[in-house]
């Protein structure tokens, strides 16, 4: 098995009308928990790491873990650079073998965002690495970045069309009302805006901030063209809550093999649920077909 580009996964998803789940990883246990479910449900998967994750565990170690698990689980997978902001950082990681990167210039004005994304696309495409970018800006907290509601804004369909044409990006993360983190009230998803974007943009669309979004909303976004669904916060909360509960019930416990497995099992339930919502179960193709 090998680390593959997300473009092969997303092309299949777009053709068949499902979405590939992208789960954020943090250590060996989170990688293993996710892949155990993907093997069980025969689902394609994208393992996403933010810059903070690569500070916690070195790139070479994460890459080696993903490669080893891909082989032992017999699952081709994509290791994705999530919310990276530096061309130099992406260049280093792509040269080390990563084949999927998100360059996040959403905090820049349109023209500056285009310039940054185009520079990343030019480099990455020469190395069979797919590129995701974001237009519009989600609120909430992601890694060390925090965007308040006043600075969040939705994606304009005509700007999205122009953005894709100018950059040559492979997939586009759109802002349609979701936010990073958990919601204090039911999110208002602009499905009409998503439909209008889909009419003028033919590349795979990406839904960020899918944690805590009602399942029926996520399914509707997939019907309207979303091919990649990002999940992070719900995974962490499930893992942490289960471990906390275990220590309350076992105050003298100290064996990571027990409490980490409890956390992993809780995370697996979230993974299983998201794969079902994305309708990606049974969609895994043999490696040679990617």
Swiss-Prot record:
Which InterPro entries does UniProt cross-reference here? Aldolase_TIM (IPR013785), Class_II_FBP_aldolase (IPR050246), FBA_II (IPR000771), TagBP_ald_KbaY (IPR023788), TagBP_ald_KbaY/GatY (IPR011288)
Looking up PANTHER family in the UniProt record yields: D-TAGATOSE-1,6-BISPHOSPHATE ALDOLASE, D-TAGATOSE-1,6-BISPHOSPHATE ALDOLASE SUBUNIT GATY-RELATED
User: Could you tell me what this protein does?
Assistant: Catalytic subunit of the tagatose-1,6-bisphosphate aldolase KbaYZ, which catalyzes the reversible aldol condensation of dihydroxyacetone phosphate (DHAP or glycerone-phosphate) with glyceraldehyde 3-phosphate (G3P) to produce tagatose 1,6-bisphosphate (TBP). Requires KbaZ subunit for full activity and stability.
Instruction: Output this protein's name.
Output: D-tagatose-1,6-bisphosphate aldolase subunit KbaY
EC number, as in UniProt = 4.1.2.40
Metabolic or biological pathway? Carbohydrate metabolism; D-tagatose 6-phosphate degradation; D-glyceraldehyde 3-phosphate and glycerone phosphate from D-tagatose 6-phosphate: step 2/2
Species this chain originates from: Salmonella arizonae (strain ATCC BAA-731 / CDC346-86 / RSK2980)
Oligomer and partners: Homotetramer. Forms a complex with KbaZ.
Query: Where, by residue number, is the active site?
Result: 82 (proton donor)
What is stated as this protein's family in its record?
Belongs to the class II fructose-bisphosphate aldolase family. TagBP aldolase KbaY subfamily.
Q: Does the keyword Lyase apply?
A: yes
Cellular component annotations (GO), alphabetically ordered: cytosol
Q: How is the cofactor bound?
A: Binds 1 zinc ion per subunit.
Superkingdom of source:
Bacteria
List, alphabetically, the Gene3D superfamilies matched. Aldolase class I
Encoding gene, per UniProt annotation: kbaY
- Needed cofactors: Zn(2+)
Asked if the record carries the keyword Zinc, the reply is yes
